[in-house]
Amino acid sequence: MTFTTESTSTRFSNPYLSTVETSDSVASVTAQIKRLSTDDQLALLWYVYTEMGTSVTPAAPGAARLQLAEGLLNQIKAMSFAEQLTFMRDLANQVDTADTRAYGILSANTKLAFWYQLAEWMRQGIVVPMPADYSASTDAYQTLEALKQLDMGQQITVLRNIVIEMGVDPLFA
């Protein structure tokens, strides 16, 4: 039997190509999320954490270190719903405030766990809930569908990419 590049490429997967495709998918969905409006980004995060939260949190090693964000989380609990929404929008828009700087110093995994906690509190009515009449854009729905097509590890990478860039890192401000 003779081997050609055609016969071997159909029989054996190329781990280098699949890695490129994987990183391209993650980068593509991350870019799609970043292009959404602030409120669509927040809605997408809320949906992902409420629908996939049980899968996301155990996979985020920083969840055990959420006590590092406890002070900021307690401040958020004490805010009015309007102030909470402003804070979340400020995070997404990287507005420089004391609270967004406090978030900015958290580790990537602690930021993942932080957003999970916010989603839990939204579900419990402690943090401003998703408005009942909120209607996400077509782009947000398409982005959510693209995110759903990724495997769990890729989804967590996309979420990490998004939450890492939120807030203001005081070391780089």
What is the predicted function of each stretch?
Residues 2-173:
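Short amphipathic alpha-helical interaction elements located at domain edges
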